[in-house]
């Protein structure tokens, strides 16, 4: 059993007797009340999705599924194809990846974990951090440097996130894939 706060994209939970893949999590904390967790869920067996809200300490039944370490191979619209060490290929639907699709790029060296339910590849868990190139960001703002100054940036793969003011186009940065946050320049 996991609490709602411990769930991450790619986890599979049993909700109302059905398996659901967590595609996105958003935690909101307030000063007096408990944390609230919004989950974007996709049904494993049917083509439906939903958003649900839970208290941070609500218990969820985490389904133990088969997981394989795989590397990204190629994109065949609408499927991402991953390959294991024995050269077996597994197709994962693009919509099952959720926000993770922004970090999957050709030639990526990081291994991913492909999750299977009843023999079907249903989701992909990325490593906790990846290194990507900044393809576009605005130049630094001079003078406005009190506190932590962040600016938007686009990375290889098309994802966007906020980066530190000193990051320039062409820089390699490390990103936390669980929170979509800039960690450091590499």
From Swiss-Prot:
Instruction: Supply the alphabetized keyword list.
Output: Cytoplasm, Elongation factor, Protein biosynthesis
Compartments, as annotated in UniProt: Cytoplasm
Task: Name the SMART domains for this protein.
Answer: EFP, Elong-fact-P_C
Q: Which GO terms describe its cellular component?
A: cytoplasm
Among the GO molecular function terms of this UniProt record, one is: translation elongation factor activity
To which protein family does this belong? Answer: Belongs to the elongation factor P family.
Q: What is this protein called?
A: Elongation factor P
Q: Which organism is it from?
A: Shewanella pealeana (strain ATCC 700345 / ANG-SQ1)
Q: Which gene encodes it?
A: efp
